[in-house]
Amino acid sequence: MDGQKRKILIVDDDAFLLDMYAIKFSQNNFEVHTAMGGTQSIDKLKAGLVPDIILMDLIMPEMDGFEMLEKINTEKLSPNSVKIVLSNKSQQSDIERATNLGVAGYIVKASSTPIEVVEQVIGILNKKVLNEKK
């Protein structure tokens, strides 16, 4: 990346995972914002948070990741943010549904260490930036 701090909104209903990923992304020059679930993330976006990346779980109470993506799209919240799923759901139908809702990447939690997640997010972001320059 270009040394500039990227803003990331991490959305999960597991406080331990939120803290762990917040630390890892902070150590890698990200400005980190967290939300405990889809509802809180939508509230933050409506309040004016404009992250470069939204990293979200799919399995959450109240509003799951799919509902969150639908709301982000319908209400045109943070339309330029790169949306990435980080979930234990690994069925092809879930990946296709998320892709159809506009995610740029899909990371399976169980097969990725926290630092691998950071590296994959950076890779997805860099690929998106390169594609926009073409």
Predicted features, each with a name:
Residues 1-7, 114-134:
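Non-catalytic signal-transmission and effector/linker regions of two-component phosphorelay proteins
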Residues 57, 87:
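Active-site residues of response regulator receiver
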Residues 19-27:
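Charged docking surfaces used in two-component/phosphorelay signaling
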Residues 43, 66-79:
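Short amphipathic alpha-helix used as the core "switch/output" element in two-component signaling
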